[in-house]
Design a protein with these regions (language model features):
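Short N-proximal segments of mature Sec-exported proteins
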Residues: 19-81, 101
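N-terminal signal peptide c-region/cleavage motif recognized by signal peptidases
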Residues: 4, 11-13
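Short, compact, well-ordered microdomains
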Residues: 81-110
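Generic N-terminal initiation segments characterized by hydrophobic and/or small/turn-forming residues
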Residues: 5-7, 22-23, 96
Length: 110
């Protein structure tokens, strides 16, 4: 399934059907109806979950944010641009596309 499943061990099927889609999250990230904070919290939760599930043997890191890191707002703005340019992921779980974006933006070993 999606990158999220591989990283976090989620199952497919009904569980995936309950996840927020990328296009749904984009509405929050664009600040529609004053919901930008929802985007910030969701994105931070996905990243924090990624950080605590790292294991060198079974789940090696693939996102390496170099310091000084950009602001959360800057990263969200870049994520919105990325998601709008990658509409093939619009119906995919938002957590998956956040991780895809971060892996491309902050690759390890570069």
């Amino acid at each position: 399934m999606a990158l999220t499943s591989a990283v976090l061990g989620f199952s497919t099927g009904a569980q995936a059907a309950n996840m927020i889609s990328t296009q749904e999250l984009l509405q929050d990230c664009k600040g529609a109806n004053g919901t930008f904070i929802t985007c910030e919290i969701y994105g931070q939760a996905v990243y924090d979950t990624y950080l605590v599930t790292r294991n060198p043997k079974s789940a090696p890191e693939f996102i390496c944010v170099k310091q000084p890191a950009p602001t959360r707002k800057e990263v969200i703005q870049e994520y919105v641009k990325w998601a709008e340019a990658n509409t093939k992921y619009a119906t995919e779980p938002a957590a998956d596309t956040i991780l895809r974006f971060l892996a491309g933006k902050f690759p390890c070993g570069k």
